[in-house]
Amino acid sequence: MATKWGICSAGKISNDFVVALSTLPAVDHQVVAIAARDLEKAKNFAQNHNIPKAYGSYEELAKDPDIDVIYVGAIHPVHRDVVLMCLQNGKNILCEKPLAMNAAQVQELIATARKFNVFLMEAFWSRFFPVYEEIRALLSQKAIGDVKFIRAEFGVEIYKVPRAVEKELGGGALLDIGCYCVQFVTMVFNGERPESVTAKGFLHETGVDESMSLILQYSGKRQAVLSSTIMATLPNQAAICGTKGIIQIPSDMWSPTSIIVNGKERKFDIPHTTKPMNFSNGTGMSYEAEHVRQCLLKGLKESPIMSLADSEMVASIMDEALQQLGVTYP
């Protein structure tokens, strides 16, 4: 039986997610409905991707009995309300990062998912890439000894994009792209809470963070330094440094196709498509989609790889950082 997907929002990320699904066997994954707040947009999206049903409201999607799981690709300020409504209608959910605007909202969504006994996962697609699987394997084998230091950065010049700077649209570097660095550290340190979070950065004229660096201090004198910006393109690398070696992601740390372990590089292929995509390596979203399918087949209510506890931890670290910079959202 195929996993039947409903798609919430007809934006760029939803396009790439549906294209990524098309690289998987059609006997396993089917998109049965798309919803947008503009029915015409939904109809156009449906036509482009051969989706049978198009809705002009998210509520209709939440109530559709044919759907097994909903992918929420809407902008982050609406995540809480949309996910809440879908969960209350008994729908399993894969929601784009950040899961919500703050840790309190994340906790509310987790509690609701448990109350209605449905699956919920934050779509940190990075964690399901072969490179990330390899990193987890290397860490569990203690291949680089004890981890002492982590560095990660994600910066792209998107300050002219309204979504990246407008407060009402959930703009700012940390929530949009810096979150990938926070989840990276959270994965490496197995969801451990840092002993301290120190944030330094600059605010945009709109009041969101345009550039930010975080220092996270962990027990046992372990440290992580994370940087994110919407003002310039960074090398976008990551490194995990241990007592016996180093693991490096040379580029695109959020969607990597290669890894360097103690100076030796290994490359990994990702699914190929001829269809137009908006984001680099976007077909890699197929990994998280297949993971969700496997979780549902096993009757799981959360992912063992991207746990709800990790989502809560990432949100609480970002809360602390934004508070230190004086960023508040409506």
UniProtKB/Swiss-Prot annotation:
One of its GO terms (molecular function) is D-xylose 1-dehydrogenase (NADP+) activity. It is an enzyme of class 1 (oxidoreductase). The record marks D176 as: May play an important role for the adaptation of the alcohol substrate into the binding site. Its EC number is 1.3.1.20, 1.1.1.179. Keywords: NADP, Oxidoreductase. The record marks Y71, H79, K97 as: May play an important role in coenzyme binding. It catalyses: (1R,2R)-1,2-dihydrobenzene-1,2-diol + NADP(+) = catechol + NADPH + H(+); D-xylose + NADP(+) = D-xylono-1,5-lactone + NADPH + H(+). The record marks Y180 as: May play an important role in catalytic activity. Belongs to the Gfo/Idh/MocA family. Homodimer. This is Trans-1,2-dihydrobenzene-1,2-diol dehydrogenase. It comes from Xenopus tropicalis (Western clawed frog). The gene is dhdh.
